[in-house]
Amino acid sequence: MKYVLKADEMKACDEYTINGIGIPSMVLMERAALSVVSALEERKIPLKGKKALIAAGTGNNGGDGLAIGRLLSRIGAEVTFYLEGNLQKLSVETKAQVRILKNMGFSILSKTEDDEYDMVVDALFGIGLSGEITGSFKEAIEKINRQKEWGAFVCSVDIPSGICADTGKIYGCAVKADLTVAFAFAKRGHLLYPGRAYTGELAVADIGIPKAAFREAIPSGFYYGKEELSKLLPGRSPWGNKGTFGKVLLLAGSHDMSGACILCGKAVLLKIITPACNREIVQQSLPEALLYTFEGRPDEEAVKKALLWADVVVAGPGMGCGEASYQLLSQVLESASHPMVIDADGLNLLAMHRKLWELAGGHKDTLILTPHPGELMRLIKAASTEAASMQAGHQREASVQSAYPQSEASGALMTEYPANRETIIRGLAKELKAIVAAKDAATLVAEDGRDEIFFNTSGNDGMAAAGSGDVLAGIIGGLAAQGMNGFESACLGVYLHGLAGDEARRKLGAYGMLAGDICESIPDVMRKASPV
């Protein structure tokens, strides 16, 4: 597990390291500069004899940049130093770096030249930026991006200039980096779009800030790395049988919607409840699955027996929003005492029917919701409408009121969704006492009552294909059936799903991928994680 920090959390770590532990800020700055140069060398970026532009601001990020330029010059780079901003407002450390450079005979320009460079180090703004970029700073960023278009390698110091460290928002304009070297910990803006698209490759460098600098304020954000995967996967007993590794009951499929049922079911040992029209194709595609089909409405006793057999229920993929689906989901929510994953039409049914909403909120075990942005919007609208009606009777908690004050507010919240994702997702998790895996280009996972929030770093745009979410629901259900707790199942499921998508893209390319290719790539990912 790796931490993802907000700007104020990182600032607190810096301050405690300097003032509490006693490591001088200039030492940290020198360590930061060394880490950037090391990152460039590790990636075999040509440096000796190459023209490098250091674009520095007046804050400590600029000081880092000036120190980087000094080190690059020592290994043979032809360095041009450019300092943008009011020189009367230099930070103490940046002023010291300017003095060092002048003592060494370097010139520092106050205006960029139109030369072409082999490399640009972006050190204009760090994680403290909080307003729109205009004027000469905007011109400087545009020139850096132009250098990139001309073929220069762009390395951003800590975060690309112009990106909000907390949300990934662009403050008017931003540097498009090839590599970003983050100091000590990743920041939210590195992992959330659009900032993630501007970050390029992310390298997190140890500059000497210890975890003790958190004191008792442990960061809430975290993500996984590939090297952790083997430890995250549930163990397998050498004397286990087919029932040892979990049994999933899948409520999926409707007329002309058998595909979602098949895609979701490929990841696990399962029993499927689906309309009779899907029997033949499901049996052909998933011969391993146990199957119960029905005409009209499912038999209640048959559903109860299926629930007794299962360890986990997955409901929703392709099941439609008709009366039979409503009755089936209603019965399962009332009767099941299992962890439950609700996806796709299951989520739409929750948003449509107050009874289902109330049953979901009172579910006896773990409830995991996996909405894409459109489904999330419908759930938010339902939550805000419910909140408005409850407020009339003075029954709503203040915390939920603040998240969903009225039905009209849902539109405004979703308009500002990129900047308010964490608040919105946490609010929905609280409303339904659930785990919410909010699918997006950068999926987040939050749980009611839990401070931690998971930031997914795997996956790619080739996964934006019909059925991809059905595969995810099956993966999460399979992990939960093996005994993992709900939050860990959702986090690991999202990460594995993205890794499988990355593997499929590697083999087929983004344009050639289908959801079934993600399924086919899961064994490759698992084999790499557990090669023995």
Description of each model-found segment:
Residues 421-429, 486-500, 515-523:
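Short, well-structured alpha-helical segments that form the helix of a local strand-helix-strand
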Residues 20-27, 256, 425, 453-467:
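Short pre-catalytic strand/loop immediately N-terminal to key active-site residues, enriched for Gly-Thr
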Residues 237-295:
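Radical SAM [4Fe-4S] cluster-binding motif and immediate context
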Residues 55-71, 241-244, 252-264, 268, ...:
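Glycine/serine-rich anion-binding loops at beta->alpha junctions
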